[in-house]
Amino acid sequence: MASLLSPIIKLLSYVIRCYQLIISPLIKPHCRFLPTCSQYSITAIHRFGIFKGIWLTLIRILRCNPWSQGGEDQVPLNIFDKREY
């Protein structure tokens, strides 16, 4: 199973990286967090796998809105890290 997931993780990382290099420069920067949501996504997927990584990414994207103060928000080292989502 892990051997099947590794190419998928690489593909997702590639798609996100293409977004960072091609699409992101064309639109107004609006991510309120550091690291950016796309970099957060790559780190989360590599650290926790596809499903947990995508879940953390979705939660992060929902928090990245005009009413959020933003700031530094690193991917947790432990999926059960007690953070406010």
Swiss-Prot record:
GO CC term (a single one): plasma membrane
Keyword 4Fe-4S in annotation: no
Membrane topology type: Peripheral membrane protein
Keyword field: Cell membrane, Membrane
InterPro entries named in the record: Membr_insert_effic_factor_YidD
A Pfam family of this chain: YidD
Matching HAMAP family: UPF0161_YidD
Entry similarity comment: Belongs to the UPF0161 family.
Descriptive protein name: Putative membrane protein insertion efficiency factor
Source organism of this protein record: Baumannia cicadellinicola subsp. Homalodisca coagulata
